[in-house]
């Protein structure tokens, strides 16, 4: 494999010295870029874009042509696993993802297959291999999956939700059915991420988008327990390098200590958590990724730079910080503002690494 020309993202995740703080953006390949919209129109629809390795590679590389980002992230969706399990994923205009056959009972769970990542999800692995080839060692490639809990919310609710009453009803009235589903999902995610690593992903991230809707006790039992199982089952070395693992629970700032106990290398922070506080609490165990409010990118350039400076100062001197937004970039952000953000991170972080 090609030697990595820029490995500062991987080094920062392992709390090793870097010259400047590395930066990438969640959803950096996305609808805020006109070139993304053009490629998506060419594909026809979102899942066709995900399933075409050449086009998925093209949109993965688009933000790297605009900005000096320190990592590429696979263009895919967290719902590829439930789709491969046969739930009938489709996208409703203005509604987001929906499933034709949501999970309603333990009997439904028992019927679910565990997808073979090189068969039913082979299109994802083809995309990983294509992107790695086209990156030519410029920056590392991040692979990812949704967490078992987050995937289960979509599978049981039948799509996006605001109150999560359907899955919480299952959690409190039929916990054994939900545990059976989460167990299957944990196995599926482990296989899926390991296949991404073998195909060329140099770091992986688990997105627990909806863990923050749980009580502390339920988070431990129904979300973190299964992420811990996945971390235990992941390949941690490939191509002679450690493959760092990042866990990200949106709204999970109060559980960082428990998350750091899983054996992951880094924790993602949303913008509601103070990064200085997070470093005091868990910085001796894990790297931290984050955590500017994505809405800050609507601000004028000086305000964006001021916010970058504040977060860098909050983390302070030394290693173990990957700069990112606290969640995905919004689709109506001016691409020039994203450029201001990336440039500011590199320029303003130099003194913190001397």
From Swiss-Prot:
Protein name: Uroporphyrinogen decarboxylase
EC numbers on record: 4.1.1.37
UniProt GO MF annotations: uroporphyrinogen decarboxylase activity
One Pfam assignment: URO-D
Enzymatic reactions: uroporphyrinogen III + 4 H(+) = coproporphyrinogen III + 4 CO2
InterPro entries attached to this UniProt entry: UROD/MetE-like_sf, Uroporphyrinogen_deCO2ase_HemE, Uroporphyrinogen_deCOase
Any one GO BP annotation for this protein: protoporphyrinogen IX biosynthetic process from glutamate
Membrane-spanning intervals of the chain: none
Record-listed substrate binding positions: 27-31, 77, 154, 209, 327
Stated family: Belongs to the uroporphyrinogen decarboxylase family.
Residues of the signal peptide: none
UniProt keyword annotations, A-Z: Cytoplasm, Decarboxylase, Lyase, Porphyrin biosynthesis
One Gene Ontology cellular component annotation held by this UniProt entry: cytosol
Job description of the protein: Catalyzes the decarboxylation of four acetate groups of uroporphyrinogen-III to yield coproporphyrinogen-III.
Record's subcellular location: Cytoplasm
This protein's record includes keyword tRNA-binding: no
Subunit structure: Homodimer.
Pathway where this protein functions: Porphyrin-containing compound metabolism; protoporphyrin-IX biosynthesis; coproporphyrinogen-III from 5-aminolevulinate: step 4/4
Enzyme class: lyase
NCBIfam families named in the record: hemE
Record-marked site positions (Transition state stabilizer): 77
């Amino acid at each position: 494999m090609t030697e990595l020309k820029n490995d500062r993202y991987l080094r920062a995740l392992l709390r090793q010295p870097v010259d400047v703080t590395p930066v990438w953006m969640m959803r950096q390949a996305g609808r805020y870029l006109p070139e993304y919209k053009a490629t998506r129109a060419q594909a026809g629809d979102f899942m066709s874009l995900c399933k075409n390795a050449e086009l998925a590679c093209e949109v993965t590389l688009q933000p790297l042509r605009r900005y000096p980002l320190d990592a590429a992230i696979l263009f895919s969706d967290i719902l590829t696993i439930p789709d491969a399990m046969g739930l009938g994923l489709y996208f409703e205009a203005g509604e987001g993802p929906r499933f034709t056959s949501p999970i309603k009972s333990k009997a439904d769970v028992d019927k679910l297959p565990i997808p073979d990542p090189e068969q039913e999800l082979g299109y994802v692995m083809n995309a990983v291999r294509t992107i790695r080839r086209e990156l030519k060692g410029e920056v590392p490639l991040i692979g990812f999956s949704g967490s078992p809990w987050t995937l289960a919310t979509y599978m049981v609710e039948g799509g996006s939700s605001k109150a999560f009453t359907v899955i919480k009803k299952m959690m409190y009235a039929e916990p054994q059915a939900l545990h059976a589903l989460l167990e299957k999902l944990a196995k599926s995610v482990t296989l899926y991420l390991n296949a991404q690593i073998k195909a060329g992903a140099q770091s992986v991230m688990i997105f627990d988008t909806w863990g923050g809707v749980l009580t502390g006790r339920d988070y431990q039992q129904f979300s973190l327990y299964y992420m811990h199982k996945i971390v235990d089952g992941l390949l941690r070395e490939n191509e002679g390098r450690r493959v760092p693992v990042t866990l990200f629970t949106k709204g999970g700032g109060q559980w960082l200590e428990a998350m750091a106990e899983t054996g992951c290398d880094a924790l993602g922070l949303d913008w509601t958590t103070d990064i200085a506080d997070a470093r005091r609490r868990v910085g001796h165990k894990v790297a931290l990724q984050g955590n500017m409010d994505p809405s800050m990118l609507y601000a004028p350039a000086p305000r964006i730079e001021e916010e970058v400076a504040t977060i860098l100062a909050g983390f302070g001197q030394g290693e173990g910080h990957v700069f990112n937004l606290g969640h995905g970039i919004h689709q109506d952000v001016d691409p020039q503002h994203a450029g201001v953000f990336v440039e500011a991170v590199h320029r303003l972080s130099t003194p913190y690494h001397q």
